Amino acid sequence: MELAALAKTRLMSMTEASCIFCKIVSREINTEFIAETNNTLAFRDIAPLANVHLLVIPKQHHRDVVELANNAPEILSEVLRTATDLAKKFTAGSFKLQFNTGAEAGQTVFHAHAHVLSDSAKDGS
Protein backbone atom coordinates (compact mmCIF):
# COMPACT_ATOMS: atom_id res chain seq x y z
CA MET A 1 0.00 0.00 0.00
CA GLU A 2 1.25 3.45 -0.92
CA LEU A 3 2.29 5.67 2.03
CA ALA A 4 -0.34 8.35 1.29
CA ALA A 5 -3.09 5.72 1.09
CA LEU A 6 -1.89 4.14 4.33
CA ALA A 7 -1.91 7.53 6.08
CA LYS A 8 -5.44 8.23 4.82
CA THR A 9 -6.64 4.80 5.99
CA ARG A 10 -5.06 5.29 9.41
CA LEU A 11 -6.60 8.79 9.77
CA MET A 12 -10.00 7.46 8.72
CA SER A 13 -9.76 4.63 11.27
CA MET A 14 -8.81 7.06 14.05
CA THR A 15 -11.69 9.34 13.08
CA GLU A 16 -14.17 6.47 13.14
CA ALA A 17 -12.73 5.16 16.42
CA SER A 18 -13.30 8.53 18.10
CA CYS A 19 -16.68 9.25 16.43
CA ILE A 20 -19.49 9.47 18.99
CA PHE A 21 -22.07 8.27 16.44
CA CYS A 22 -19.90 5.26 15.54
CA LYS A 23 -19.77 4.48 19.26
CA ILE A 24 -23.58 4.69 19.38
CA VAL A 25 -23.83 2.35 16.36
CA SER A 26 -21.47 -0.17 18.01
CA ARG A 27 -23.45 0.11 21.29
CA GLU A 28 -20.40 1.43 23.18
CA ILE A 29 -22.60 4.37 24.19
CA ASN A 30 -26.01 3.45 25.54
CA THR A 31 -28.71 5.27 23.59
CA GLU A 32 -32.47 4.86 23.38
CA PHE A 33 -33.28 4.27 19.72
CA ILE A 34 -36.62 5.35 18.32
CA ALA A 35 -36.04 3.55 15.01
CA GLU A 36 -33.57 1.18 13.42
CA THR A 37 -33.27 -0.18 9.89
CA ASN A 38 -30.57 -2.28 8.25
CA ASN A 39 -28.52 0.84 7.56
CA THR A 40 -29.81 3.57 9.91
CA LEU A 41 -30.40 4.43 13.55
CA ALA A 42 -32.58 7.20 14.94
CA PHE A 43 -32.67 8.78 18.37
CA ARG A 44 -33.60 12.05 20.10
CA ASP A 45 -31.05 14.87 20.10
CA ILE A 46 -29.49 15.37 23.56
CA ALA A 47 -29.68 19.18 23.17
CA PRO A 48 -32.97 19.72 21.31
CA LEU A 49 -33.49 22.93 19.37
CA ALA A 50 -37.23 22.30 18.87
CA ASN A 51 -40.09 20.43 20.53
CA VAL A 52 -39.26 17.54 18.20
CA HIS A 53 -35.55 17.13 17.44
CA LEU A 54 -34.56 13.71 16.15
CA LEU A 55 -31.35 12.50 14.54
CA VAL A 56 -31.17 9.87 11.82
CA ILE A 57 -27.70 8.49 11.13
CA PRO A 58 -26.28 5.93 8.73
CA LYS A 59 -24.67 3.02 10.56
CA GLN A 60 -21.74 3.29 8.16
CA HIS A 61 -19.34 6.17 8.86
CA HIS A 62 -19.40 9.00 6.30
CA ARG A 63 -18.02 12.40 7.28
CA ASP A 64 -20.99 14.37 5.94
CA VAL A 65 -24.01 14.13 3.66
CA VAL A 66 -21.96 14.96 0.55
CA GLU A 67 -19.61 12.04 1.21
CA LEU A 68 -22.63 9.82 1.94
CA ALA A 69 -24.35 10.87 -1.31
CA ASN A 70 -21.21 10.24 -3.35
CA ASN A 71 -20.28 6.89 -1.77
CA ALA A 72 -23.58 5.33 -0.71
CA PRO A 73 -26.62 7.03 -2.29
CA GLU A 74 -28.83 4.05 -1.42
CA ILE A 75 -28.04 4.57 2.28
CA LEU A 76 -28.77 8.30 1.97
CA SER A 77 -32.13 7.35 0.49
CA GLU A 78 -32.78 5.11 3.51
CA VAL A 79 -31.82 7.96 5.87
CA LEU A 80 -34.38 10.18 4.11
CA ARG A 81 -37.12 7.51 4.23
CA THR A 82 -36.47 6.91 7.93
CA ALA A 83 -36.53 10.65 8.66
CA THR A 84 -39.80 11.09 6.76
CA ASP A 85 -41.42 8.14 8.56
CA LEU A 86 -40.36 9.57 11.92
CA ALA A 87 -41.64 13.03 11.01
CA LYS A 88 -45.06 11.49 10.27
CA LYS A 89 -44.97 9.65 13.60
CA PHE A 90 -43.70 12.44 15.88
CA THR A 91 -44.80 15.76 14.33
CA ALA A 92 -48.18 17.35 13.71
CA GLY A 93 -47.32 17.66 10.02
CA SER A 94 -44.83 20.44 9.40
CA PHE A 95 -41.13 19.77 9.93
CA LYS A 96 -37.62 20.68 8.81
CA LEU A 97 -35.20 18.09 7.50
CA GLN A 98 -31.69 19.48 7.87
CA PHE A 99 -28.13 18.37 7.12
CA ASN A 100 -25.25 20.56 8.33
CA THR A 101 -22.14 20.12 6.20
CA GLY A 102 -18.91 21.54 7.61
CA ALA A 103 -18.09 23.34 10.84
CA GLU A 104 -19.01 26.77 9.42
CA ALA A 105 -22.49 25.41 8.63
CA GLY A 106 -22.95 24.15 12.19
CA GLN A 107 -21.83 20.53 11.84
CA THR A 108 -20.46 19.47 15.23
CA VAL A 109 -20.37 15.67 14.79
CA PHE A 110 -18.49 14.66 11.66
CA HIS A 111 -20.61 11.62 10.85
CA ALA A 112 -23.42 12.29 8.36
CA HIS A 113 -26.77 12.78 10.06
CA ALA A 114 -30.18 14.27 9.38
CA HIS A 115 -31.99 16.49 11.86
CA VAL A 116 -35.79 16.20 11.96
CA LEU A 117 -37.05 19.38 13.64
CA SER A 118 -40.54 20.63 14.43
CA ASP A 119 -42.17 22.88 16.99
CA SER A 120 -45.45 21.00 16.53
CA ALA A 121 -45.25 17.61 18.21
CA LYS A 122 -47.95 15.05 17.59
CA ASP A 123 -50.02 14.48 20.74
CA GLY A 124 -48.43 11.80 22.89
CA SER A 125 -44.98 11.84 21.26
Predicted segments — roles?
Residues 2-125:
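HIT superfamily nucleotide-processing domains
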